[in-house]
Amino acid sequence: MSSFTMYTTPWCGYCHRLKSQLDREGISYDIVDIEQVPDAALIVEQANGGNQTVPTLVYSDGTAQTNPSLAQVKEKIASLG
């Protein structure tokens, strides 16, 4: 089971980079393309003050990070226990 969902778009370079880093580390996550899932865009907007900024990660505890580094993601996952 993944501890977070990554909201992304196909053209987002930062998203591709973070996905590659997570995959190399063997970190599992769910992925949602906000251009294909309109309700997902609303989630991203709520996490980013009305902006559709990606990548936005939403964790199992309801918190979010926008364009985090791999280290920030690993730290957050560790804090979730």
Go through each PLM region and give its residues:
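Residues at alpha-helix termini
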Residues: E25, A47-N48, L80
